C-alpha cells in the first residue's frame, strides 16, 4: 500500500528531512554502558551497526540517526536493517540512508512481514453508545458482528464492515473518538509499539487517499500527560498494587484497565484515559 508506506516515511523522518542528530556508534556505545536496562539489546544493535559497515551497504559517515539507534528515511533499527532491508534501486546494496527506493521498498517489506494485507484497510472511525461498558483495546479482538451487537456504529451511519476480527480502540477514553481496528493496524503498531504511532500512520494513510480526518471530538476538559507524567502515573498505579508493567510512559491495555479501576474507586467517569485529572487524584491520595 503506497499510501501507508508514504505515511511511515512522513511520520518517521518528515520525508527524509529529520532524524539525523546522533552518530550511531557513539550513541549506541553510550547506551550499552549507561542504560539502566536493555543493555544487551543495545549491544546487539551496536554489533548490527558494525555488520552493516562490514557488509558494505553504507559508509561510516552515513550512520547518523536517533539517540536510540534508528536511522534512515524510515528509521530502521540496525538489526531490522540487516533483517529486512532490501535493494530497491538495483545497485546491489541496501542503502536506507541515501536511496529513497531502497528505504521505501524496505518499509514495504517490513509491513508485509508484519502481516499487512494489500488492499485491506486498517480500520475506521466508529461511535460507541452512551454508557458503553464492553471490552476495548487493540488486542481484544472480536468479529464485526460482536461489535454490532454492542451498539458500535460507523461514524456517519451505516453498518460495520471488514473481514476478520477487530479491536475497539478508544485512545482518549469513552468520551473521545473510537476506532475499529483490524490486522493492518497491528502491522502499523509493530513498527513502533505505540497506539499513538499506529493511529498517526493509519489516519495519515487515509488522508493521503483523500478521505476525511477524524470526526469525533477529542476531550478538552482534561489535559493530556507528558511522557514523564505518564511514567509517574504508572508508578503511582504500581504502588497501589496494579500490574501495569514497566513504568515506561507507554500506555497499554494494563495501564488503561488500572486507570478505569481507580476512576471507579474515586467516583470518576470510567474512561481509562491517562489525563491530568486522574494523575492529580492519585497524587493527592
Language model regions located:
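Acidic/histidine-rich, surface-exposed loop or edge segments in extracytoplasmic proteins
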Residues: 182
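Catalytic glycan-binding domains that act on GlcNAc-containing polysaccharides
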Residues: 1-164, 176-179, 187-205, 210-227, ...
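Short secondary-structure transition/capping segments
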Residues: 16, 102, 257-260, 283-285
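Short acidic, glycine/serine/threonine-rich helix-capping segments at coil-helix boundaries
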Residues: 225-230, 238-282
Amino acid at each position: 500500500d503506497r499510501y501507508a508506506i508514504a505515511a511511515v516515511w512522513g511520520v518517521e523522518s518528515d520525508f527524509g528531512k529529520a532524524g539525523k542528530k546522533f552518530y550511531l556508534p557513539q550513541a549506541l556505545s553510550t547506551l550499552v554502558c549507561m542504560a539502566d536496562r536493555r543493555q544487551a539489546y543495545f549491544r546487539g544493535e551496536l554489533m548490527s551497526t558494525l555488520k552493516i559497515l562490514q557488509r558494505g551497504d553504507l559508509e561510516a559517515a552515513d550512520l547518523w540517526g536517533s539517540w536510540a539507534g534508528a536511522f534512515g528515511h524510515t528509521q530502521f533499527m540496525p538489526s531490522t536493517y540487516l533483517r529486512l532491508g532490501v535493494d530497491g534501486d538495483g545497485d546491489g546494496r541496501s542503502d536506507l540512508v541515501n536511496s529513497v527506493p531502497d528505504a521505501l521498498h524496505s518499509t514495504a517489506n517490513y509491513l508485509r512481514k508484519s502481516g499487512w494485507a494489500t488492499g485491506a484497510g486498517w480500520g475506521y472511525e466508529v461511535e460507541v453508545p452512551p454508557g458503553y461498558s464492553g471490552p476495548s483495546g487493540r488486542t481484544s479482538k472480536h468479529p464485526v458482528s460482536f461489535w454490532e451487537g454492542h451498539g458500535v456504529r460507523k461514524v456517519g451511519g451505516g453498518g460495520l464492515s471488514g473481514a476478520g476480527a477487530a479491536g475497539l480502540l478508544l485512545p482518549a477514553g469513552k468520551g473521545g473518538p473510537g476506532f475499529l481496528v483490524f490486522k493492518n493496524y497491528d502491522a502499523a503498531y509493530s513498527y513502533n509499539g505505540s497506539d499513538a504511532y499506529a493511529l498517526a500512520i493509519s489516519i495519515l494513510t487515509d488522508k493521503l487517499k483523500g478521505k476525511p480526518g477524524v470526526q469525533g471530538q477529542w476531550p478538552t476538559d482534561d489535559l493530556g500527560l507528558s511522557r514523564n507524567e505518564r511514567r509517574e502515573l504508572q508508578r503511582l498505579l504500581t504502588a497501589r498494587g496494579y500490574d501495569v508493567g514497566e513504568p515506561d510512559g507507554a500506555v497499554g491495555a494494563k495501564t488503561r484497565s488500572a486507570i478505569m479501576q481507580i476512576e471507579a474507586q474515586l467516583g470518576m467517569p470510567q474512561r481509562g484515559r491517562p489525563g491530568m485529572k486522574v494523575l492529580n487524584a492519585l497524587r493527592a491520595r
